[in-house]
Amino acid sequence: MVKNAFISVISQEENRGSVEFQVVSFTNKIRRLTSHLEFHRKDFLSQRGLRKILGKRQRLLSYLSKKDKVRYTELISQLDIRELTTR
């Protein structure tokens, strides 16, 4: 189980409304829910919550990629998540 796995650079930042902080907190929630769902495969409410959080994080990442590509690539590399795929 992953708890309090904030990246040190972003956790020291006091601006909790920033896009980076929100993406980090969503990523931590996603990792916790993923580890929970490995043990409880039939927990459909948690699966729904995971899908909602994934959508929120995807929208924030697309916003950040449009506004500031450098900050987006830094955040993606620090969190070790995949880049957005365009449809």
Curated annotation (Swiss-Prot):
Protein name, per record: Small ribosomal subunit protein uS15c
Stored Pfam families: Ribosomal_S15
Organism: Oenothera glazioviana (Large-flowered evening primrose)
Gene: rps15
GO terms for biological process, alphabetical: translation
Record's subunit section: Part of the 30S ribosomal subunit.
GO cellular component terms attached to this protein's record: chloroplast; ribonucleoprotein complex; ribosome
Localization: Plastid, Chloroplast
Matching PANTHER family: RIBOSOMAL PROTEIN S15, BACTERIAL AND ORGANELLAR, SMALL RIBOSOMAL SUBUNIT PROTEIN US15M
Presence of keyword Ribosomal protein: yes
Keywords: Chloroplast, Plastid, Ribonucleoprotein, Ribosomal protein
UniProt key word Transmembrane: no
Top-level taxon of origin: Eukaryota
